[in-house]
């Protein structure tokens, strides 16, 4: 149920635990479109990931399960990922490039975010939270390791596409001081002195998308 891995070599891959290397290979092969050809390896990696409760392994196998059209396992893994994230912030041992610290956090969180985006009703708030955590790890040279940077960018781009599609499907009404805001822009005519009230109403509660409210003003009173 696993792959025959070379034990020699001087790079970081040689020191990666076999269970993680096998999980990554299954993940990569399902990404490439393979399915029944690696069923035994997939089943073995799935069992090990669920037993490990490791965030990195679980997130990869969630994505693999989706590609394998294994809905039952996908949901089971996502439940475990959600529990792990809420309890411990998604603890992981290491990654396929033997990452630690910030790089490992970015890789694990990016994979978890990508897995969340595969759900029929993605948890947008959770994904936003994960991406915010990832962006905080960004340095001048990227998000840590090359693998971490690639996964971080993939998560950000995928989320942009997801939100864009949801925004097209969402029916949102903005009301400022009981006046509908039709063009999503307001002027002084819509505002009054003192307290102003902005109401955002989603006509489809299952199609909620994030929004930004930008206020610009000048005043003679400091």
What are these regions (language model features)?
Residues 1:
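Extracellular LysM carbohydrate-binding repeats and other cell-envelope/extracellular binding modules
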Residues 5-15, 20-222:
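Long, domain-scale non-catalytic interaction/scaffolding regions in large secretory-pathway
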